[in-house]
Amino acid sequence: MTRKHILSFALMTALGMTVTSTAFAQLHLEIAKAPEQAPKIAIVPFGNDQSIFPIVENDLNRSGRFSSASKNLPTTASIDAIQASAWQAAGIPYVVVGNLKPAANNAFEVHYQLYDVQKQQYLLNEVLTVPASRVRQAAHMISDAIYQALTGIAGDFSGRIAYVLRNPATPDQRYTLQIADTDGEQPKTVLSSRDPILSPAWTPDAKKIAYVSFETKRPAIYLQDLATGQREVLASFKGLNGAPSFSPDGKSMLFTASMNGNPEIYQMDLSTRQLQRMTNDNAIDTEARYAPDGKSFIFTSDRGGSPQIYRYSFDDSSTKRLTFRGAFNARGTLSADGKNIALVHRPSGSNYKVAIMNISTGIVNILTPTSLDESPSFSPNGQMVVYATYEGSRGLLSIMSTDGRFRMNLPSEQGEVREPAWAPK
């Protein structure tokens, strides 16, 4: 790869830039791959409600850990009585039942139970009280609880994903930064602009989001409060400003800037706005991401001749190369436990794939069957990865379980969707 190609790569990836077209329409969930064998779980329609059970069923299916049973179910299940023998005969080990009841102040009580057929006991027996406007959110919370009860791992169905859209149908081909549920439902627009919006990055409390905007005709990093809509400029230095990433305590931000001529990584103290230059060489250093413990960060650099992932330690200011397999490794992001890196990987002679590298062993496993993949982002529990890809000429988001058992697509009917970022919990 020539220096010209590497610089082009840095300008695109340090800012997360992808020139594509997208629509404002809601994303539509499409199952691309389902697990061949997974424990069955029956989600019985809830009493007085027909909206909750399909959401829970869909959530658990797309985890890759379970397969919902929806046909020829025993009719004896209710919130008060479950006949274990009927479910044993049907070969279904887990059953979810529930009901919805009106409560005061335009709210609802959602009572749900998770039943272990073999043990003949309830694993969950809970009541949620939610406003009428949050019944869908309650369904995702039920999915989270069921997933944790059966796997011991916190569920991420009630989370959110940020992404960037561009609508080619409008005269100015407008960009929007949107946030939606992890199944693509309930999209909300954070910002709309005729100029590119790139590299969304959540603050650790998920109350604010940073992004790169070209509204002044040059890249600048903004921080926007999601509740109030208020925003402020964090970085608008001469040249490149991109790839923001927040420290686990939310007090600092790493970003790429070329104010001194070469793309380097800087750290900003968000209370004082003081800068510290973290890299200083002739290479292109970009895409910094803090480790979960805040003691180091990973980044992409071409200092070895091709884009690879490196780690910088705050303790001794040392830098260590992490990736050695493949001609290209970039856009690294760490799992919440700090053990794995999801990255864009290109084996020699192949297309760009999302892969997961175990940091302790250095083993890189290609995760995705698609090509031209970019922008991987782990779910908070580390069990799923969302990324942008193409299927034919269609640009879309895809979510895949890290064991490769399940994949779903989130396309827009009228355009393309890019730059996903999974919100922290």
Curated annotation (Swiss-Prot):
Compartments (UniProt record): Periplasm
GO terms for biological process, alphabetical: cell division; protein import
Signal peptide (UniProt feature, chain positions): 1-25
One Pfam family this sequence matches: TolB_N
UniProtKB keywords: Cell cycle, Cell division, Periplasm, Signal
GO cellular component, one term: periplasmic space
Intrachain disulfide bonds: none
Family as reported in the entry's similarity comment: Belongs to the TolB family.
NCBIfam families, per database record: propeller_TolB
HAMAP family the UniProt entry points to: TolB (MF_00671)
Subunit structure comment from the entry: The Tol-Pal system is composed of five core proteins: the inner membrane proteins TolA, TolQ and TolR, the periplasmic protein TolB and the outer membrane protein Pal. They form a network linking the inner and outer membranes and the peptidoglycan layer.
Descriptive protein name: Tol-Pal system protein TolB
Gene that encodes it: tolB
